[in-house]
């Protein structure tokens, strides 16, 4: 008789869901993958995917080992005085790169995006829907402005952390924030 109900072993079940999610995201991209599809491939009920991860965004973050929670990221950007958004974004971004446990996945992701159109498409779709569109809606701004700000931050990451170009690579976070925050703020002041 076939077993019904929950699979034994939380860790095995969670890892099985993550493996299925990686396959679904690889085959269908972020936009085409669904919780139901991930659950079907993992052989579990969709409710179990929600139990472990909460949302498709969170499954994606876990599957790609992204070192941030998109909901927390959005809240951190939109909460607080609007005239300080540029500084908040730069500080938040620099903070994510300070620790090896978050820096390593970011470096791997940046290098993967540069070499894999599939990974680039998945990350782009995820960022557009899970971060940029939500920030744009919360602040009543055109998405183009958020995309421009994101491009500045990606450029900063490439120069400071991937290329390690001096003097940007060794500048203090305060120096970088003082230099870059006004540029980012410009996109939010329209």
Per-range role (PLM):
Residues 1-44, 54-58:
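Basic, helix-initiating cap at the start of DNA-binding domains
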Residues 47:
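Key DNA-contact positions within bacterial/archaeal DNA-binding proteins
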Residues 93, 106-113, 149-153, 157:
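Short alpha-helical scaffolding segments that buttress acidic/His motifs in well-ordered protein cores
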């Amino acid at each position: 008789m076939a077993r019904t109900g929950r699979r034994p072993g939380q860790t095995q079940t969670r890892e099985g869901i993550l493996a299925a999610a990686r396959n679904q995201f690889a085959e269908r991209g972020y936009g085409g993958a669904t919780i139901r599809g991930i659950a079907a491939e993992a052989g579990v009920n969709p409710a179990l995917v929600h139990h472990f991860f909460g949302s498709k965004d969170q499954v994606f973050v876990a599957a790609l080992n992204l070192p941030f929670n998109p909901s927390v990221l959005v809240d951190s950007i939109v909460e607080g005085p609007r005239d300080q958004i540029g500084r908040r974004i730069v500080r938040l971004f620099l903070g994510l790169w300070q620790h090896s446990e978050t820096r390593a996945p970011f470096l791997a992701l940046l290098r993967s995006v540069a070499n894999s159109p599939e990974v680039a498409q998945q990350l782009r779709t995820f960022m557009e829907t899970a971060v940029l569109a939500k920030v744009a809606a919360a602040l009543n701004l055109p998405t183009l402005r958020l995309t421009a700000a994101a491009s500045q931050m990606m450029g900063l990451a490439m120069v400071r952390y991937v290329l390690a170009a001096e003097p940007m690579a060794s500048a203090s976070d305060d120096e970088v924030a003082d230099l870059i925050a006004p540029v980012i703020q410009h996109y939010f002041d329209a």
